[in-house]
């Protein structure tokens, strides 16, 4: 009979520390939990515990992941989780040496985020029927997402007190508890105002909620539900580009850079703590400029 997996208590202690000291989002904490539990399961199958691990054990686990054909990006994220976890154990004096000290991350090719052209965005945003309460909500969400570059988790969790239509701003508490103010833009303000006055009350019914964009059940919408809504409108618009929940966030950043926005301004709007995270969008913008040059320059 297979032995039931018992999660090492060190994992929960680490996650509790992250939650209380760093203010990380539930999604980030969930990713850490998934990574650490996978490593812990492997160790237990080898008769090892998390606190007894050496560099050879980590390397053996990485070799196992290669054999199991895990993606390099997945292993890179896992190594980041392990580094933070073992640094916590070191700082709290639960281990005497860091098994991650000489472990290198796999080299990754810089993946350009999937994005949409400006004409594709126009087609996508034109699809929702604003006479229908659900699609009126979706129209406002799409316009706001493209205007602000919010993460989908930030959009679906948006509350009324975070938004000032008079000032045209949304106040976001992003990763690590960092606050940022993001301009909404006139078109997004118009669509959100229309939604608030004509459709939101129909979705809420008699339920009181501070959530700006409730689901049909008057609850906070999930990221997965909104992703499915995006794919629905993309299909109706005849857009065949592979979409992700962050497609409009990527389009927001790329289109700003295409129109001459300063990289550090885009960094602030996106809520990136590291400029290098934002810089990948310059590659997207540059690729688009090269494409336009080849299409339209007489010697392209």
From Swiss-Prot:
Cellular location of this protein? Cytoplasm
Cited CDD domains: INT_XerDC_C
Q: Name one GO molecular function term.
A: DNA binding
Write down the InterPro entries for this protein, in alphabetical order: CB, DNA_brk_join_enz, Integrase-like_cat_sf, Integrase_catalytic, Integrase_recombinase_N, Integrase_SAM-like_N, Recomb_XerD, Tyrosine_recombinase_XerC/XerD
Catalytic residues, per the record, are: 151, 175, 246, 249, 272, 281
Q: What is its main location?
A: cytoplasm
Q: Which residues form the signal peptide?
A: none
Which intervals hold domain Tyr recombinase? 111-294
Keywords recorded for this protein, A-Z: Cell cycle, Cell division, Chromosome partition, Cytoplasm, DNA integration, DNA recombination, DNA-binding
Describe the task this protein carries out.
Site-specific tyrosine recombinase, which acts by catalyzing the cutting and rejoining of the recombining DNA molecules. The XerC-XerD complex is essential to convert dimers of the bacterial chromosome into monomers to permit their segregation at cell division. It also contributes to the segregational stability of plasmids.
The Swiss-Prot or TrEMBL record describes its family as follows: Belongs to the 'phage' integrase family. XerD subfamily.
Q: How does it assemble?
A: Forms a cyclic heterotetrameric complex composed of two molecules of XerC and two molecules of XerD.
Identification of the protein by name: Tyrosine recombinase XerD
- This protein's encoding gene: xerD
């Amino acid at each position: 009979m297979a032995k039931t997996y018992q999660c090492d208590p060190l994992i929960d202690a680490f996650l509790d520390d992250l939650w209380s000291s760093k203010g990380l989002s539930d999604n980030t904490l969930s990713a850490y939990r998934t990574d650490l539990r996978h490593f812990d399961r492997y160790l237990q199958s080898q008769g090892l515990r998390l606190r007894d691990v050496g560099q050879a054990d980590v390397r053996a686990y990485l070799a196992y992941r290669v054999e199991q054909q895990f993606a390099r990006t997945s292993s890179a994220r896992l190594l980041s989780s392990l580094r933070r976890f073992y640094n916590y154990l070191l700082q709290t004096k639960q281990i005497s040496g860091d098994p991650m000290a000489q472990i290198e991350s796999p080299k990754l090719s810089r993946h350009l985020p999937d994005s949409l052209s400006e004409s594709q965005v126009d087609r996508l945003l034109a699809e929702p029927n604003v006479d229908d309460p659900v699609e009126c909500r979706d129209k406002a969400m799409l316009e706001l997402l493209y205007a602000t570059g919010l993460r989908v988790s930030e959009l679906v969790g948006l509350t009324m007190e975070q938004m000032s239509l008079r000032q045209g701003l949304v106040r976001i508490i992003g990763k690590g508890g960092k606050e940022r103010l993001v301009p909404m833009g006139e078109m997004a303000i118009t669509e959100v105002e229309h939604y608030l006055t004509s459709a939101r009350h129909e979705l809420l019914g008699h339920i009181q909620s501070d959530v700006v964009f409730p689901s049909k059940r008057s609850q906070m919408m999930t990221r997965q539900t909104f992703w499915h809504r995006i794919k629905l409108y993309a299909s109706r618009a005849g857009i065949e580009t592979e979409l992700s929940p962050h497609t409009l966030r990527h389009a927001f950043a790329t289109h700003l850079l295409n129109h001459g926005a300063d990289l550090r301004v885009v960094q602030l709007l996106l809520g990136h703590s590291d400029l290098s995270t934002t810089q990948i969008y310059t590659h997207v913008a540059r690729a688009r400029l090269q494409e336009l040059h080849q299409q339209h320059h007489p010697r392209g």
